[in-house]
């Protein structure tokens, strides 16, 4: 084979950048609420604070992040084909809130819930919405590995790729419109004194149906509170083709999931997983189907 033929047969190497996210869900119980949602903690922002997760005094340090109001409009085909393929497509609007705008109360069942004291984003603000998609690499609905796509073109390309060009972004329909009030804490130091291997965030979400809030009513009755611990990493390769990058991405996602699992097991009293945590989309689908 000629030298030119060898060059033509060689795989094309390039700089490839992608995002990897792994997450594990938990039920925010009374211990979580007492440590993270007390009046004193609610006033702390951009200040490191050490938490002790268990009786052996295993500790980690967090910094509370600004609260957010998030509107997610999810899209799929009429037969939910994208969901079946492990792809979730949405338009997301994020509004960063001023210090301590969210107040929490505790219900009789000891679940922490956010008081609904914030307005829904207006139609004028929807121009700031961004297209986003999450493709599941592995795991299940409680413990999941994702790769993310940001921007309309990347999302559109992924929809075409995963459906083998059978479905365009314009062919999708709205399947849910949800409003999330979010509190989050960035983990800066683990029990061994080291920093997490990637950006680690503890998240508490209260989710409602956006349309019901927009109508000024509570007619939907849908409300769901769920916690997550997430690891997010930007992955860059310089010496791999697309196939090699994809394989490396899956390896990294698996390692990060193992790290997340260990962190939550060490602090099992804070991040309870019994009964099995239910994600917001699963909870919404169950609620919606019960009303059909």
Predicted regions mapped to residue ranges:
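Phosphate-end processing signature that detects enzymes handling 5′-triphosphorylated RNA
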Residues: 2-292
């Amino acid at each position: 084979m000629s030298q030119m033929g060898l060059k033509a047969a060689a795989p094309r190497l390039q700089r490839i950048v992608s995002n990897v996210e792994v997450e594990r869900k938990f039920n925010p119980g009374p211990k979580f609420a007492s440590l993270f949602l007390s009046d004193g903690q609610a006033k702390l922002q951009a200040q490191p604070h050490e938490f002790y997760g268990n009786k052996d005094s295993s500790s980690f340090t967090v910094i509370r992040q600004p609260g957010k109001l998030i509107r997610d409009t999810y899209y799929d085909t009429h037969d939910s084909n994208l969901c079946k393929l492990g792809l979730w497509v949405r338009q997301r609007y994020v509004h960063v809130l001023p210090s301590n705008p969210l107040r929490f109360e505790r219900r009789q069942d000891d679940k922490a819930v956010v008081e609904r004291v914030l307005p829904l984003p207006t139609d004028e603000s929807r121009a700031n919405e961004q297209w986003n998609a999450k493709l599941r690499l592995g795991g299940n609905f409680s413990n999941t590995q994702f790769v993310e796509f940001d921007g309309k073109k990347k999302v559109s390309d992924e929809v075409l790729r995963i459906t083998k060009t059978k479905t365009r972004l314009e062919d999708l329909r709205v399947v849910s419109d949800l409003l999330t009030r979010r509190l989050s804490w960035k983990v800066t130091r683990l029990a061994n004194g080291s920093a997490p291997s990637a950006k680690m965030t503890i998240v508490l979400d209260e989710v409602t149906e956006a349309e019901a809030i927009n109508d000024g009513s509570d007619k939907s009755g849908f409300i769901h509170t769920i916690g997550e611990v997430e690891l997010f990493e930007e992955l860059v390769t310089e010496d791999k083709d697309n196939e090699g990058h994809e394989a490396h991405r899956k390896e990294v996602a698996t390692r990060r999931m193992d790290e997340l699992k260990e962190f939550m097991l060490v602090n099992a009293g804070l991040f309870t997983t019994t009964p099995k945590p239910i994600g917001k989309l699963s909870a919404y689908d169950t609620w919606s189907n019960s009303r059909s």
